[in-house]
Regions:
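Cap/lid segment of the alpha/beta-hydrolase catalytic domain
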Residues: 99-108, 130-153
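The feature captures the conserved acid-bearing segment of alpha/beta-hydrolase catalytic domains
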Residues: 197-286
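Alpha/beta-hydrolase fold nucleophile elbow
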Residues: 171-183
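Short, surface-exposed "cap/lid" segments of acyl-processing enzymes
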Residues: 75-123, 127
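Alpha/beta-hydrolase active-site loop
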Residues: 142, 146-170
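A domain-start/cap signature at the N-terminus of enzymes
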Residues: 39-85
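Glycine-rich nucleophile elbow surrounding the catalytic serine of serine-hydrolase chemistry
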Residues: 181-192
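C-terminal accessory extensions appended to soluble enzyme cores
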Residues: 249-347
């Protein structure tokens, strides 16, 4: 049994439960019980059907109010399928509802129309019916993971415990984990990497959606070792040339602080262990290695424009889940093309 605090009714299961561990420094306000028979696992009662797109959700808040979590899952979870548990760390300045997205009406906040993570997830589920996709939205109270880490004692330990505890809730599904994030959300991913001696075997994909500001050379060894562990492990990095952007009369980022610089540094570091092929056209520079296990896509920016969230909106989140798979095909979607998920946007 896992003791975690969430402000919802107790979950009930038909078989006996067991104590697993107590989530230190990030205790939620309710009890969740892990069903111990995988063959007959039930989904927790605390989830509520959304009434849209055959989904169910549960909102979770830690007792100190520092992290808000929303877990979204399909109602037709099949325990015979492979399950991907996606941890999506929110970008700076965004709420969970903005990040999910919806069809906007006059007067709506513009943030509702710039990511559409919910609709992109629905498109992924529609396209890949052989796998389960459970999505975990993670929002820091400051709406900034870098600020949260700076102001939270033992932040690395808390990040790891959050990932471990939420993963344990779905133990009967033996999920594979995807660490994903946009903008400052990359700080959450690096927080997890810094918290572990070795990237765990259940991490099957890491995606930085213009979010690798925090990359340092110290991370390369762990990433290289993880990529060598399994051909199933995949790394995707999306970035644009933010080094040429002038905003309000000043450079948007420092010469070494943007994702353009950090992504190229990561590619150079990884090239010490892996042979890359590089292609360029008028729009992108693409670096690949290990037959698509590693893909780093850098958008050129001759006009000095801001493409920060557009990389996510224009099918970037879909790419983050499908890169290196049979679904990474133009007949299904094009990165930086038209939004293929319009039909899946909630009213």
């Amino acid at each position: 049994m896992i003791k975690i605090a969430i402000k919802i009714p107790k979950y009930k299961f038909r078989n006996s439960c067991y104590w697993f561990y107590i989530l230190k420094n990030c205790v939620f306000s309710f009890l969740l019980f892990i069903y111990t028979n995988p063959a007959h696992a039930q989904f927790p009662e605390g989830f509520s059907a959304t009434g849209n797109f055959d989904e169910q959700e549960i909102s979770v808040t830690d007792t100190s109010g520092k992290v808000s979590i929303l877990i979204n899952a399909p109602t037709n979870l099949d325990h015979k399928r492979k399950t991907f548990l996606i941890f999506y760390a929110l970008p700076n300045g965004n709420t969970i509802e903005w990040t999910k997205g919806k069809k906007t009406q006059p007067g709506d906040d513009w943030h509702f129309n710039i990511q559409h993570i919910a609709a992109q997830t629905r498109y992924v589920r529609h396209l890949d019916k052989k796998n389960n996709y459970i999505l975990v939205y993670l929002m820091a109270a400051q709406k900034s993971w870098p600020a949260w880490k700076r102001n939270t004692p033992d932040s690395l330990h808390i990040i790891k415990k959050m990932v471990d505890s939420i993963t344990a809730l779905f133990a009967s599904l033996s999920p594979k984990i995807i660490l994903n994030g946009h903008s400052g959300g990359g700080s959450f991913i690096f927080g997890f990497l810094d918290a572990v001696e070795k990237i765990p075997a259940n991490i099957e994909r890491i995606a930085f959606l213009d979010s690798d500001y925090g990359y340092e050379e110290k991370h390369k060894t762990k990433i290289i070792q993880w990529l060598k562990q399994s051909k199933k492990n995949k790394l995707l990095v999306l970035a644009y040339n933010d080094s040429v952007v002038i905003y309000n009369g000043k450079p948007l980022v420092s010469p070494t602080g943007g994702t353009w610089y950090r992504s190229r540094l990561m590619q150079r570091n990884l090239s010490e262990a892996f042979a890359f092929t590089s292609d360029a056209d008028t729009a992108f520079i693409t670096h690949e290695a290990l037959k698509g296990q590693i893909k780093i896509i850098l958008k050129k920016n001759p006009g000095g424009l801001i493409y920060h969230t557009e990389q996510v909106e224009r099918n970037g989140f879909i790419l983050s889940l499908f890169s290196g798979t049979k679904f990474n095909n133009k007949k299904y979607f094009t990165y930086f093309g038209d939004r293929v998920y319009e039909h899946w946007i909630k009213d």
